[in-house]
């Protein structure tokens, strides 16, 4: 059985894609009222604006009202996934080749559960990282969570835009 987050993903993802957005993450936070937090990114690499979040929010809200997946009262928050966005799909690793990433694993790999390094390659359900002077091969299924890292190099590129 699918979680409510997966059900929401299923009903909104295509519409967001049609609007030029990637659905990054759906999660619940808070209790009374619940908050449905939805993180989006641009498919073309552009920055996400407040207007983008507003447009996406209106579309998502209309879909959720029709689908009626959430029983209790809730509020909807749509936001940019940010500079240190989570990587939640295998395809994300190919999109961000060469970028620095922090990865937390579900279990030990070479005596560690945390790795930070540049994404060298993502192929056959494996992530190849350059960590300091060594290459680390991580099975995608071992990843608990991963986020991009805001490095000085990325920051300088942003300042030039």
From Swiss-Prot:
Keyword annotations: Cytoplasm, Ribosome biogenesis
Places the protein is found: Cytoplasm
InterPro entries in UniProt: Ribosome_maturation_RimP, RimP_C, RimP_C_sf, RimP_N, RimP_N_sf
Gene Ontology biological process terms from the UniProt entry: ribosomal small subunit assembly; translation
Cytoplasm in keyword set: yes
Cellular compartments per GO CC: cytosol
Main location (coarse class): cytoplasm
UniProt keyword annotation of Nucleotide-binding present: no
SS bonds (residue pairs): none
Superkingdom assignment: Bacteria
Family: Belongs to the RimP family.
Function: Required for maturation of 30S ribosomal subunits.
PANTHER family noted in UniProt: RIBOSOME MATURATION FACTOR RIMP (PTHR33867:SF1)
NCBIfam families: PRK00092.4-3
Name listed for the protein in its UniProt record: Ribosome maturation factor RimP
Organism: Rickettsia felis (strain ATCC VR-1525 / URRWXCal2)
Gene: rimP
């Amino acid at each position: 059985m699918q979680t409510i987050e997966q059900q929401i993903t299923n009903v909104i993802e295509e519409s967001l894609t049609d609007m030029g957005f990637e659905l990054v993450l759906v999660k619940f936070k808070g209790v009374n009222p619940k908050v449905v937090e939805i993180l989006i990114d641009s498919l073309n690499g552009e920055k996400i604006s407040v207007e983008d979040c507003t447009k996406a929010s209106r579309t998502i809200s209309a879909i959720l009202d029709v689908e009626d997946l959430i029983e209790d009262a809730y509020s909807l928050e749509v936001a940019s996934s940010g500079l240190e966005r989570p990587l939640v799909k295998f395809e994300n690793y190919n999109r961000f080749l060469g970028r620095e990433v922090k990865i937390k694993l579900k279990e030990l790999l070479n005596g560690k559960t945390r790795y930070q390094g540049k994404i060298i390659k993502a192929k056959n359900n494996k992530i190849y990282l350059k960590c300091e002077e060594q290459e680390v091969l991580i099975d995608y299924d071992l990843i608990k969570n991963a986020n991009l890292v805001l490095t000085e190099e990325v920051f300088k590129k942003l300042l030039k835009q």
